[in-house]
Amino acid sequence: MGEALIDIIVTPDGDIDSVVGGGPVNTARAIARLGTKVSFIGGISHDALGKRIRQLLDADNVMCSIDGDCAAPTTLAIASLDEQGAASYQFLIHGTSSLSVTPEIALSALDANATAVHIGTLAFVFTPLSQATRAVVAALDDDQILMMDPNARPAVMENSSEFWETFNSSLDRADVVKCSGDDLDYMFPDLNNLDAARDIHERSHATVLFTDGSQGVHVFMENDYFQCDVPKINVVDTVGAGDSLSGGFLSFWDRYNLKRSDTRDADKIRAAVEFGIKVAGLTCGRAGAMPPFAHELD
């Protein structure tokens, strides 16, 4: 659940390309390409860029839960890449399709049979989408897994109180929280990243996955901590890498019919994280958020 947008990608040399993006869309596409049934709750415009988004989701077998005819223009993100392929973002969001989702629309689109719900990025920040996110979290059944990824974007977070209200209320229900060093730097500027990730776990008792670039993924669980290594790869860019890890994690969970209670099992968490790392690694090896298909991991 969250935003669907177009990423305008600018290379260090000034070359410009565009791809379908938005953290929640990237996550949904990763899940679908791995063969898991998934639906996307988010506003998609009926303009030319919105049609491009919908066509790509259709091609990847991502179901769109909101069928409404959104007249607002498509949300845009400008992703500027540095020499290492890391992206920094600017957004054009006010008055666009991503903010067309109200709590009523989101609740009507929520599938009661969904085994897991993923939330994050701009859905934590801007009303009414943030309000819709909180409504969906409050409506989850006891057996539904909640995975959240704050994916903080300080450049557009004019209202940090809205972010914190959504984050904290969702954290009370969360089973798995994925966060990056950039997220933790923004959220806990007075703590080092490991202490910040540990703090999130201790506040919520959720399993926390701190993605630490080449240092791997640090996992904080009840009475346990471990680190999953990442292989050395040829990085083209990191756009969608964290989203692909989340998608891989959730697809693994579905593939092996794991339950909400299994999020307390360290062996199962480790296996799901390691699978997510493989998915993210393949995504980093190509330009834009282009997660792999299941056969590429065989």
Predicted ranges, named:
Residues P189-D298:
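Conserved phosphate-binding/catalytic region of the ribokinase-like
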